[in-house]
């Protein structure tokens, strides 16, 4: 009898857990796991909506969503640059929702038909270990052109466009500024100064933190975190201007928890949701002008930004990455 009672209780608990899991909002997150958890936990605390997160970088996430189109296994795609969400919209993988907060977002931070909304933005920057450059009697760079200085030979880390969307954003920035041919000429001229092309978009800031390199190129959060923690790191926004990512979210077509998916969109685009970016120390820049990113985090109007066409970015990625490998690496 005791065994039967225990078995009954165990079965009941498993049923409850399964029911709870079935009703949780399932999120495919292309935001890094640490920061995605911070934001989704804040969402749960604010709304009571439980979430289940599966981390997938942008390419695998889009492939999985497309493969599951006939039987969606997630409710929301959370993160990945907006050009990925444009592709998802074009492929019929998402559905529109006009959040009441959309009016507080500029056009670049939302789809006009409501298929995607931005979560945050991050500009590109150069992270500088001022102590190392000082010891080498090398100047602090102020521009993209400065990075070609022979004094920096073998001292710069940046991601590889073959594996990182961050590096692809660098290519797009330079194309927008200079034109395609001149952009690839610049990257070829920069190549002797590159210590290594990392696989991960955030690896350069890690190398900067441990003093492996004095110069790193990537999106700002890793640099801002190091500076906030007291490292001798300066964040430089090249004077010619920088590109930026617009990390976005979409509700997936056929979402089983549609109402809760809408709640996530509403919360993330609200003042409270945007405030969570700084409250949880993500070092991401808010997309609302009426919300501060927190101490040490710049506002968008303090940076010379270079906008790129997300549709062009989506349609030309394979070609441009292959050209980078050919022109810069000689592959």
Q: Which residues make up each language-model segment?
A:
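Early extracytoplasmic/lumenal segment of secretory-pathway proteins
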Residues: 24-87
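Extracytoplasmic ligand-binding site segments that recognize negatively charged/polar headgroups
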Residues: 31-34, 73-212
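A ligand-binding cleft/hinge motif common to bilobed small-molecule-binding domains
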Residues: 83-87, 209, 213-232, 281
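Short beta-strand->loop
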Residues: 94-101, 116-117, 145, 214-215, ...
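Periplasmic-binding protein-like
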Residues: 122, 186-191, 197-198, 229-253, ...
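A bilobed periplasmic-binding-protein/Venus flytrap-type ligand-binding module shared by bacterial periplasmic
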Residues: 127-132, 172, 246-258, 276
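Mature extracytoplasmic/periplasmic domains
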Residues: 252-309
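Extracellular/periplasmic bilobal clamshell ligand-binding domains
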Residues: 295-331
